[in-house]
């Protein structure tokens, strides 16, 4: 029953966040195997968080609808290609052959729901259906303020997740909204642990982990200077103090 409910909410959550769930299952498995590997083109976090952005481009990533400028590089565009029968590099390299048909089917369902939202908006002469179904990622991208804490400013191509990943302490409301993913080092070390158990896991292994940032503000106190330095020197990274095991 729990597995069944997990699958239902995974499908719903994936649609809400523009992830085709089959593709995301396998590409995210790759990410957890090779965290921040610049040699792996399908490590999403590496592609998103390790391109040494300027402070200007970093700040623009929080501006509503700004991501539409790069629609051809978005997950939505990839889903449309999968729905139309195109084989993308991530489909070829990450998704098992027996899962490809499932990926295409779910991609087509996503596209049909997007089209239906536009049709309903047109019929009602009201933008709300499209804004709530197709556009949330674009007007709600302020949520990136959480996501950006995961790996930004940290080293690449290091197998020890404690160096490449950051944990932050959030207030209870932020923690609930973020599904406890602020315990991100713990999540990478033990990806099969459910998110609601990450605080307990963190407490059990805290003597083996680098010190977590105490808040969003504390995290960005180290992230923003690192962005400025990395834009000028791409060999720079934040060095975390990691306990020996």
For the regions a language model picked out, list residue spans one by one:
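Helix-boundary and loop/linker segments of multi-pass membrane transporters
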Residues: 1, 122, 167-169
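Transmembrane alpha-helical segments that form the membrane-embedded catalytic/substrate-channel core
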Residues: 20, 69-76, 132-159
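Short, motif-level signal for alpha-helix interfacial/capping segments enriched in acidic residues
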Residues: 128-131, 158-168, 172
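Histidine-centered catalytic micro-motifs
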Residues: 24-36, 146-153, 177-193
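Flexible, active-site-adjacent loop/turn segments at secondary-structure boundaries
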Residues: 42, 166, 188
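Membrane-embedded alpha-helical segments that form the functional core of polytopic membrane enzymes
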Residues: 8-22, 136-140, 169-180
């Amino acid at each position: 029953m729990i597995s069944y409910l997990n699958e239902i909410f995974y499908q719903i959550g994936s649609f809400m966040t523009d992830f085709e769930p089959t593709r995301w299952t396998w590409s995210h498995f790759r990410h957890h195997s090779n965290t921040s590997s610049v040699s792996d083109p399908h490590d999403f976090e590496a592609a998103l968080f390790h391109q040494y952005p300027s402070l200007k481009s970093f700040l623009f990533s929080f501006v509503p609808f700004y991501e539409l400028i790069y629609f051809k590089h978005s997950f939505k565009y990839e889903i449309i290609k999968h729905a139309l029968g195109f084989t993308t590099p991530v489909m070829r390299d990450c998704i098992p052959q027996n899962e490809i048909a499932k990926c295409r089917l779910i991609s087509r369902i996503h596209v049909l729901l997007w089209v239906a939202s536009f049709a309903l908006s047109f019929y009602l002469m009201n933008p709300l259906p499209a804004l709530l179904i197709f556009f949330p990622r674009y007007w709600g991208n302020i949520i990136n303020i959480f996501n950006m804490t995961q790996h930004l400013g940290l080293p690449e191509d290091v197998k020890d997740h404690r160096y490449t990943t950051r944990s932050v302490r959030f207030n209870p409301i932020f923690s609930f909204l973020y599904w406890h993913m602020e315990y991100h080092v713990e999540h990478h070390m033990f990806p099969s642990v459910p998110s609601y158990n990450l605080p307990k896991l963190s407490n059990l292994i805290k003597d083996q982990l680098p010190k977590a940032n105490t808040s969003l503000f504390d995290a960005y106190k180290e992230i923003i200077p690192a962005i400025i330095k990395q834009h000028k020197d791409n060999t720079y990274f934040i060095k975390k103090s990691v306990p020996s095991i």
